[in-house]
Every structure is written in structure tokens, then in C-alpha cells.
């Protein structure tokens, strides 16, 4: 409960600070739409970074082999004891060669190891399942990020046209709106709508952030289909590099996506569009005579995010895509946590397997030492096939002596098999 409250508090603090940063970064000389431009560019850069997410950072195993490693180690230990002849020479973990007997005790330990191995194989199968499903989640997230940028129009080889509609409406007012228009379909197009100033070629401008200039043509100055495309294309071509600098180098997380969308949504229907002919808000919502069609160069751009006389923020397509990407990333983080828990159980089983194997080695050593005639000269006494380390831990996974005990070994195995 404390952790949940802490996360909620952190999210609110981040949002408050972010709003403060947005407000303080918009100076008196900045365009009236600077806050909206910064919000869209931030989301655009998050989506761009999301397109490049790497498997090694997001998949629960750093490669399929990592999910299989522990089970393979246990299988190797099992195979050392899996012999049917009267005896077999095995190599211990510290490199010593020992002749193990296929005794009743060895067969019992082999049966225990078989159970440990079966449990490890079950865990491996679960890990691989999460690994494969995570690959699908990652691809889904990256696809959603791309669609947020370019919409359903694809990603043409010409960068200036990437994210712009393949078919424009008859005028800017119809294009730059959510209901029945192209508004809300891609971040690129919404930035172009926000930053172009008028329908007419006479003084048609792009104005956002520190950048402004002549579009060369207006939304209505090209006969035939797609007459708004040149103006939108020119605006995006001139703003693209600046927009990418706004939040360059962002590290994508589900929390960052959510918090940045909160900032964006907080600007809808709240900031007046001063100097507009028809628009009440820069990011419009339900309002009387809200329209983003303009006729003079002094008017600023806007986007009409209303739909059918009802507030429909959830119908912004690129926002839906970012929300889906956020969900994909949360699923990836959950999978990583689950696989980490499974890995801890697998390593516990691995410890149990090593303990069982080392017990067999020690039994062989004790039997060998017991069968030797007593030596009268300590300096000439022969040593057995396996030397006990003088201190615990000097030999990898090898207990320091019989004090490790069958009781302790059974306890470890019992706990491992219950996991």
C-alpha cells in the first residue's frame, strides 16, 4: 500500500513539475502556441525513441540461451550420476576425477536429481514462454510508436511527407479537426496543423517554438486533390529538426508516456486561442463555433479535438497508439519480474543439485579412506581421489566435510522441490 501511495505521489509531483517547466519555458516572446508545441514534440520524441527499443533492455532473458542456462547446468550434474555400470569416473566441479559407485545410495540420489531436473525443466519452459510472449509485446510496442508518429498513412521514403495524410480534405478547417478530418491521426500532422497560420498563400506562415517562416503556399492554393499537402509538408520540413531537439535523448518508460499524455490532455480546451478567426482554444474541444480555418497570416494555428458535440479525447488516434504502447511496456516489465522470480527458484534448484552430487563424491571419498590400511607415517600417507578443502568455499560448490550432513542436504532438497 505504501509503495502504491509513493508511486501516485511521485506521478503527481512529476506532473506538477512538468507543468511548471512548461509554463516557465514559455516566455513573453514565445509564440502563443509554445506550450502545445512542446507537448506534441515531447510525445513525438518519446515515440521516436520507442521505435528503437532494444531486446536486451526489455526482454526478460538477454537471449533465449539465458533462459535455458540453469536447467542445462542441472542436467549436466544429473548426467554425471546417470550411469548403470558398477562404477563410473566423473569429474567434479573443481576438476578432480573420482570413481563413483553405482550403489543404492547413488541410485537414490539419482532419483532425487531427476526430480530436481524435472522441476528445473518446468521453470525453463515457463521462462521461455514469457520470453517469446515478450518478443511479441516489444514488436507491438514499437509498431504502436510508429503508428503514433505516422498514423495509418505509412512511412514513405520522403521524410517531409512521413506522417502526412495521403488524401487531404477540401480546406484547413476540415483537415485539422478530429471529427471527420485528419486531426488526431498522427503526431506529425497535428504539429503541422498547430504550426501553420492560414489557408491563404498570401503570407501563409509556419510558427512554432523559435521557428517561423513562409510556407510558400496555403491550404487552399493548389487546385485538385491534396491541395493542403504542400503547406503542411513545408511546415513539417522546417520544424522537424527543431521538434526533435525539444526532448532529445528521452528514456522511454510507461510512466513517462502516461505523465506526458496527462500534460497534453491538460492543454485541451483550457488555453484561449487569441488572434484566431474561428478557434476558441488552441487545442480545441467542445466549444461554440470552434474551427481551425483561418484567412490571414496573423492568425495562429490550432487543432479541433472535438467530436459530434461531445468531448471525445479518447478518439485521438495517436494517443490511443501511445496508450497501447504504454500497456505493452508495462506487460514487458511484469514479464521481467516474473522471470526473475522463476530464475531465483531455478538457482535454488541448482544449489540443491550440486549438493546432491557433492554428497555422492564425499561418500566415495569416505568409503575409499575407510578401506585403506592405517598409515604409520603421516609424511608418506597417500591421499584419496578427492581432497577436502581446508576452508569452506575453497572448492566450488564442494562442502567442507561430512558436517554438511545428510539432514541439511535433505532440507535443501525438500525446500527446492516445494518451490
From Swiss-Prot:
A lipid is attached at residue 400 (GPI-anchor amidated serine). Coiled coil: none annotated. Residues 369-405 are annotated as: Disordered. It is a lipid-anchor; GPI-anchor. The keyword Signal applies. Residues 1-28 form the signal peptide. It comes from the Eukaryota. It is found in: Cell membrane. Keywords: Cell membrane, Glycoprotein, GPI-anchor, Lipoprotein, Membrane, Signal, Trypanosomiasis. Glycans are attached at residues 82, 358, 379. Residues 395-405 have a biased composition (Low complexity). VSG forms a coat on the surface of the parasite. The trypanosome evades the immune response of the host by expressing a series of antigenically distinct VSGs from an estimated 1000 VSG genes. This is Variant surface glycoprotein YnAT 1.1. It comes from Trypanosoma congolense.
